[in-house]
């Protein structure tokens, strides 16, 4: 009997998680189309097909949904790259994948409101919580870059010289390109030129 109850509880929890995921995926579609400022609970309700009361069991506001989307997005971002790091794939392969992912993201951002939504959130929510979230995301970006560099060091491809500073520089360039993408004035050539400059910063072994 206890096992049956446990099984039923697990099934209920799975259904609850599935519904929460559906809300977040639907919200992502809304934010990508409308950004954050113009998105409403009504938009999200219509997109996911869950009643207003059903959504409020999980989230109390658009901002709360957006933060959950942002957290999920942050966790999933560059999952492939992190897996390659864990598997010690050749350094250049990982670096190429990292740049390729950013290139696609930046070019897609021209027509995708999600990046705009992220910056709208940071510019309109001047709170300690939003500041902490932004710092956490920047730190995570820098950490991922530094972990890629460490693979290069371990494989004898690059020297362990000023890598923390270079990782920070990468982070600034990537964030700057993201802001430029919001204006719609970013080009493939601009992205490629900046990636080439970032590569030149690396202390390759001769």
Predicted regions, residues:
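N-terminal intrinsically disordered/low-complexity leader segments
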Residues: 1-18
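Hydrophobic alpha-helical connector segments
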Residues: 68, 72, 82-110, 166-170, ...
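Helix-turn-helix
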Residues: 22, 26, 30-64, 68
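Hydrophobic/aromatic residues within well-ordered alpha-helical segments
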Residues: 19, 62, 73-77, 98, ...
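Amphipathic alpha-helical packing segments from all-alpha helical-bundle domains
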Residues: 75, 83, 127-154, 165-168
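Short amphipathic alpha-helix in the helical subdomain of ABC transporter nucleotide-binding domains
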Residues: 16-19, 141, 163-170, 191
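Amphipathic alpha-helical segments used for helix-helix packing
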Residues: 106-129, 182
């Amino acid at each position: 009997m206890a096992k049956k109850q446990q099984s039923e509880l697990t099934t209920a929890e799975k259904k609850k998680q599935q519904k929460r995921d559906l809300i977040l995926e639907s919200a992502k579609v809304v934010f990508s189309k409308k950004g954050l400022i113009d998105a409403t609970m009504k938009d999200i309700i219509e997109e996911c097909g869950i009643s207003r009361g059903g959504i409020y069991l999980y989230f109390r506001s658009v901002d709360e949904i957006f933060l959950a989307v942002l957290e999920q997005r942050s966790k999933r971002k560059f999952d492939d790259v992190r897996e390659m790091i864990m598997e010690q794939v050749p350094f250049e392969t990982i670096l190429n994948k990292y740049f390729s992912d950013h290139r696609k993201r930046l070019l897609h951002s021209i027509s995708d409101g999600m990046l705009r939504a992220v910056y709208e959130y940071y510019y309109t929510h001047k709170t300690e919580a939003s500041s902490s979230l932004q710092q956490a995301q920047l730190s995570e970006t820098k950490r991922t870059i530094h972990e890629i560099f460490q693979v290069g060091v371990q494989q004898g491809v690059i020297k362990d010289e000023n890598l923390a500073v270079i990782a920070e520089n990468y982070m600034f360039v990537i964030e700057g390109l993201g802001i430029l993408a919001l204006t719609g004035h970013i080009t493939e050539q601009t992205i490629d030129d900046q990636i080439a400059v970032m590569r030149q910063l690396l202390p390759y072994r001769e």
